[in-house]
């Protein structure tokens, strides 16, 4: 992505391909970027300079993948993991799989459907060429679904409404059901973690170019005209993907400042309106403030910075993900963390995967990021010696749409690679002691033991003094994981260590414990203790996954920073539910990420409606729920009515559970799960609360126990 350019700069121009124009017309608002030039008043220019005409034709034909799969082109021989299997790319849809799993003798397509679609498109292209008097070509104009699906998804996330199969709202439904980050940050003077701190999010490596004082063209919401008009605004403050803007002309008057997500389609570089014949109209409030607006703007714009011309194009490109619905993989069994299970990708949102267990119910799902260490390619468990549950395909799952669309196994290089390890000169041994984040209670760092050494650097770890004696609570960590630490790590960094049962935290001593258990500590040199300059600071706000209920992403705060280790506090919840995560964890996101991707964000407090909402009943199989109930922080003021969905118990715990709590009411299924809180005096007032676009019958009501 280009750096923010000065208004005086004029980049080189070249013709725009017609195919790419058509490609972008899929988006509501993105089509306005055609023939774009970064200089004001220029007549014709291009916003893409990296592709030749021949490359674009090949890409349209499906021969040059435009997604992260560009590392592999169709027919390129390449071994996956030493097994001799060759990967292949479907020439119709772009799905990556193994050649032996592909259809036909040529192995060009993943399924009969893709083969027929390719043939049909080839015929259509040939007929069209003859009608236009063009010479015939062997290349078929086919859809490259790997690229199109990402663009369609981005469009639906920003424009659409609806829910996933598990009841999770998406698109505009998710945004309205969320809360106002801008008001929350401004009212309390909070600071958000910069986008550049999160390596797994779109444009993280270019976001430092978005700076205070930058000029943009945005939709003018203070105008009474029949058509959409725009005006120039300055960036006053940045908070993750969101920026605080002020229309030009208000100068030091902050009364009309407004927040906007830079990922939306109504924010453009300076000059976009001139190129696309859009009208610049000053806000009605200050329309009479100046008589010569043109002269005023020229003085304000000379020498200023603006967004790169390809900003939205790069944003869309960075939101393409290699995982597709129907891919099979291995994932940790949430009911027994010492083993894995086969699962199928059901949904992909912003790189987060909703997985369905092959041998489970249709609602037996698991959420994680595609870079999560909890997922692995098919065959991983057998290769490293990890336990796996042998699944038997359920007959009633054959009718589930995801299982009917299984393409192939996800190839190994789609998963995040782990650091290579060398076992010469001493390695981890069974019985060695260390400190590790408890996978069943992520707010605790416990005394732990290496129970088994697997291949490829993986270790089976158990927490000393755990309730299980048969290895059911063992958990797999890689030797390079930042969730395991050498003995005395907590003591050196003033972190409370959770000792084994029968020991007191205040009096626990590692030397005495090792002598009593006749064991030895794992050498410090075996641990990965490097610490990057991550940029996180105490008090920064972000959006974090509740790993005890990984479907939920919540408003959170960085409570403590210990080298690369972050203590995440969920706003509005007691400190006992804090979680330790690594600074490069894919389970934390910048402010505005949920809005950008269309994922629902759980607010720190629940909205309080004027009337009770009708409970929604569902007739599904009752499931046990595990874990502790969350206690709300006592409010400063009692209220006669409390409304909202409770935080669910540990039903989707990615690492299983250790204690069984009370069961839910039979036949009761939570449709929309948000944390329930009392509204405090600092919560948004009733007038500023967004109106729900969905019927109140679709929201579940619960009462306190």
Swiss-Prot record:
There is a cross-link at residue 700 (Glycyl lysine isopeptide (Lys-Gly) (interchain with G-Cter in SUMO1)). PROSITE patterns: MBT, ZF_FCS. Residues 38-49 have a biased composition (Low complexity). Residues 1-84, 608-665, 680-705 are annotated as: Disordered. The gene is L3MBTL2. Residues 15-25, 50-60 have a biased composition (Acidic residues). One of its GO terms (molecular function) is histone H4K20me2 reader activity. It comes from the Eukaryota. PANTHER family: LETHAL(3)MALIGNANT BRAIN TUMOR-LIKE PROTEIN 2, POLYCOMB GROUP PROTEIN. One of its GO terms (biological process) is negative regulation of gene expression. The modification Phosphothreonine is found at residue 76. It is found in: Nucleus. A zinc finger (FCS-type) spans 81-116. This is Lethal(3)malignant brain tumor-like protein 2. The modification Phosphoserine is found at residues 13, 67, 338, 683, 688-689. Keywords: Chromatin regulator, Isopeptide bond, Metal-binding, Nucleus, Phosphoprotein, Repeat, Transcription, Transcription regulation, Ubl conjugation, Zinc, Zinc-finger. Part of the E2F6.com-1 complex in G0 phase composed of E2F6, MGA, MAX, TFDP1, CBX3, BAT8, EUHMTASE1, RING1, RNF2, MBLR, BAT8 and YAF2. There is a cross-link at residues 405, 647, 659, 675, 700 (Glycyl lysine isopeptide (Lys-Gly) (interchain with G-Cter in SUMO2)). GO terms for cellular component: nucleoplasm; nucleus. Zn(2+) binds at residues 90, 93, 110, 114. Residues 619-634 have a biased composition (Basic residues). InterPro entries: Mbt (IPR004092), MBT_L3MBTL2_rpt1 (IPR047356), MBT_L3MBTL2_rpt2 (IPR047357), PcG_chromatin_remod_factors (IPR050548), Znf_FCS (IPR012313), Znf_FCS_sf (IPR038603). Putative Polycomb group (PcG) protein. PcG proteins maintain the transcriptionally repressive state of genes, probably via a modification of chromatin, rendering it heritably changed in its expressibility. Its association with a chromatin-remodeling complex suggests that it may contribute to prevent expression of genes that trigger the cell into mitosis. Binds to monomethylated and dimethylated 'Lys-20' on histone H4. Binds histone H3 peptides that are monomethylated or dimethylated on 'Lys-4', 'Lys-9' or 'Lys-27'. Disulfide bonds: none annotated.
């Amino acid at each position: 992505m280009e750096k923010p350019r000065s208004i005086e700069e004029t980049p080189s121009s070249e013709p725009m391909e017609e195919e790419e124009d058509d490609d972008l017309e899929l988006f509501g608002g993105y089509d306005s970027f055609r023939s774009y030039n970064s200089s004001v008043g220029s007549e014709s220019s291009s916003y893409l300079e990296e592709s030749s005409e021949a490359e674009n034709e090949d890409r349209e034909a499906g021969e040059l993948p435009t997604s992260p799969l560009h590392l592999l082109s169709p027919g390129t021989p390449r071994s996956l993991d030493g097994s001799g299997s060759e990967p292949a790319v479907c020439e119709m849809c772009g799905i990556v799989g193994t050649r032996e799993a592909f259809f036909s003798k040529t192995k060009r397509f993943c399924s009969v459907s893709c083969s027929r679609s390719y043939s049909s498109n080839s015929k259509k292209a040939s007929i069209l060429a003859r009608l236009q008097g063009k010479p015939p070509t062997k290349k078929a104009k086919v859809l490259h679904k790997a690229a199109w699906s990402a663009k369609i998804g981005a469009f639906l996330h920003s424009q659409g409404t609806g829910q996933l199969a598990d009841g999770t709202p998406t698109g505009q439904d998710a945004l309205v059901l969320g809360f106002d980050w801008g008001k929350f940050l401004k009212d309390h003077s909070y600071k958000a973690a910069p986008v550049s701190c999160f390596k797994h999010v779109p444009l993280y490596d270019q976001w430092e170019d978005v700076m205070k004082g930058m000029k943009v063209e945005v939709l003018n919401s203070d105008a009474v005209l029949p058509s959409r008009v725009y005006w120039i605004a300055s960036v006053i403050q940045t908070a993750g993907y969101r920026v605080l803007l002020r229309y030009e002309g208000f100068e030091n008057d902050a009364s009309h400042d407004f927040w906007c997500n830079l990922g939306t389609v109504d924010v453009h570089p300076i000059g976009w309106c001139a190129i696309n014949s859009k009208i610049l109209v000053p806000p009605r409030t200050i329309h009479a403030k100046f008589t010569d607006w043109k002269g005023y703007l020229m003085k304000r714009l000379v020498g200023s910075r603006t967004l790169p011309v390809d900003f939205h194009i790069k944003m869309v490109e960075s939101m393409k993900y290699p995982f597709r619905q129907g891919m099979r993989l291995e994932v940790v069994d949430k009911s027994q963390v010492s083993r894995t299970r086969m699962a199928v990708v059901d949904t992909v949102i912003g790189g987060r995967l909703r997985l369905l267990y092959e041998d489970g119910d249709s609602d037996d799902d698991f959420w994680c990021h595609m870079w999560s260490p909890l997922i692995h390619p098919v065959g991983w468990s057998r290769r490293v010696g990890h336990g796996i549950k042998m699944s038997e395909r359920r007959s009633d799952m054959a009718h589930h749409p995801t299982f009917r669309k299984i393409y192939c196994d996800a190839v190994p290089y789609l998963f995040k690679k782990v650091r290579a390890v060398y076992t010469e000169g001493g390695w981890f041994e069974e019985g060695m002691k260390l400190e590790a984040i408890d996978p069943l209670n992520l707010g605790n760092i416990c005394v732990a033991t290496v129970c088994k050494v697997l291949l490829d650097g993986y270790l089976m770890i158990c927490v000393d003094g755990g309730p299980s004696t048969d290895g059911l609570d063992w958990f797999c960590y890689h030797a390079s994981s930042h969730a395991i630490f050498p003995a005395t790590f907590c003591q050196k960094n003033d972190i409370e260590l959770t000792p084994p049962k029968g020991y007191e935290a205040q009096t626990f001593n590692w030397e005495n414990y090792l002598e009593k258990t006749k064991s030895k500590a794992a050498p410090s040199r075996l641990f990965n203790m490097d610490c990057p300059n991550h940029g996180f600071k105490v008090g920064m706000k972000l959006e974090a996954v509740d790993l005890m209920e990984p479907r939920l992403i919540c408003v959170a705060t960085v409570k403590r920073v210990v080298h690369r280790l972050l203590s995440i506090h969920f706003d509005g919840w007691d400190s006992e539910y804090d979680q330790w995560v690594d600074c490069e964890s894919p389970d934390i996101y910048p402010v505005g990420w949920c809005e950008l991707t269309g994922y629902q964000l759980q607010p720190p407090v629940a909205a309080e409606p004027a009337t009770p909402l009708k409970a929604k009943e569902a007739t599904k199989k009752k499931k046990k729920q595990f874990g502790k109930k969350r206690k709300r922080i006592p409010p400063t003021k009692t209220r006669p009515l409390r409304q909202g969905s409770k935080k669910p118990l540990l039903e989707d715990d990615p690492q299983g559970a250790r204690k069984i709590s009370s069961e839910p009411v039979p036949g009761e299924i939570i449709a929309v799960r948000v944390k329930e809180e009392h509204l405090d005096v600092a919560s948004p007032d009733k007038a500023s609360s967004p109106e729900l676009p969905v019927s109140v019958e679709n929201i579940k009501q619960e009462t306190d126990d």
